[in-house]
A protein has these predicted regions:
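Hydrophobic, often amphipathic alpha-helical segments used for membrane interaction and targeting
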Residues: 1-90, 108
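C-terminal soluble interaction/assembly domains
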Residues: 71, 75-126
Length: 126
């Protein structure tokens, strides 16, 4: 009987992608295709970090992947999702799931939520 909603919509994600020049999208996709094996191994590492709850390593990986687009891909979205989280949390209790790369760091959602006065604690799975 719980209501589900998002802290980021598909339209938000599309707007984020539209801020990135087409040439950059093409360059990223070309690199992924040329480096498929390496990227597959890297994703396995990232899944292990996720399973261990190592958000610092996941944040470092997301930050490295975003390179010059950190502001667009991470920081602006962190602010948007944190603001939406706050709006919902004022009205009702909630469970919020976001990509692990958005949690850690000086501009991460955990720090933004703590700054806004929320108590933040990890939930152990399994």
């Amino acid at each position: 009987g719980k209501t589900t909603t998002g802290v980021e919509t598909f339209a938000d994600q599309l707007a984020t992608l539209r801020k990135i020049p087409f040439e950059q999208h093409l360059k990223s996709l070309t690199w992924l295709l040329k480096n498929y094996g390496r990227q597959k191994r890297r994703l396995k590492k990232m899944m292990n970090w996720y399973a261990k709850g190592d958000i610092q390593q996941l944040y470092k990986a997301a930050k490295k992947d975003a390179k010059g687009m950190r502001r667009i891909l991470l920081y602006e979205r962190n602010i948007l999702m944190t603001n939406r989280f706050e709006e919902i949390a004022r009205e009702q209790s909630l469970f919020c799931a976001v990509g692990a790369g958005h949690l850690a760091g000086g501009k991460g959602m955990l720090r933004l939520l703590k700054k806004a006065g929320f108590k933040v604690k990890p939930v152990q799975l399994g």
